[in-house]
């Protein structure tokens, strides 16, 4: 069993305080604050942003595994996770995560791609950990074969 470690350090009260988030690998060492949770344009991160990054990364790796297992090698996968953070009553909640992925995958058809993307969403370990949260998926196939053909046609017209 693998165990991954992350640490949060905080100084001060909730509103004026601030802290640092680090991970065991050393790859992340960033400031965070209450203000960075509620206001755009802050130079610090927040737990929701990091959760979105973790979910986007996990889902994308799961989709790559699904595609590879079905005999397709993706040229590129690009996923954005939008995490909705809302005040409900006296508390804040993560109410929804929207995954939006686009992919260049030679030779895969739309039906197969959509089925594999749905399976990746369902079985990604982070999706499973967030089962109490509504998770939606919009998957767009930018077929690499078609893109190449369109580029060749456009170049031929000049």
Positions of predicted regions on the chain:
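Extended beta-strand/beta-hairpin segments
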Residues: 1-53, 60-158
């Amino acid at each position: 069993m693998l165990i991954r470690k992350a640490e949060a350090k905080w100084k001060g009260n909730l509103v004026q305080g601030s802290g640092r988030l680090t991970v065991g690998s050393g790859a992340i060492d960033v400031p965070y604050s209450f203000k960075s949770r509620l206001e755009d344009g802050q130079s610090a991160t927040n737990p929701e942003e990091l959760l979105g990054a973790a979910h986007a990364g996990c889902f994308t790796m799961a989709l790559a595994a699904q595609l590879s297992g079905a005999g397709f090698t993706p040229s590129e996968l690009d996923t954005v996770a939008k995490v909705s953070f809302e005040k409900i009553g006296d508390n804040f909640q993560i109410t929804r995560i929207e995954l939006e992925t686009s992919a260049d995958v030679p030779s895969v058809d739309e039906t197969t791609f959509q089925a594999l993307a749905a399976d990746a969403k369902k079985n990604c370990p982070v999706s499973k950990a967030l089962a109490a949260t509504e998770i939606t998926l919009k998957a767009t196939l930018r077929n690499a074969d078609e893109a190449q053909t369109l580029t060749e046609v456009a170049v031929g017209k000049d």
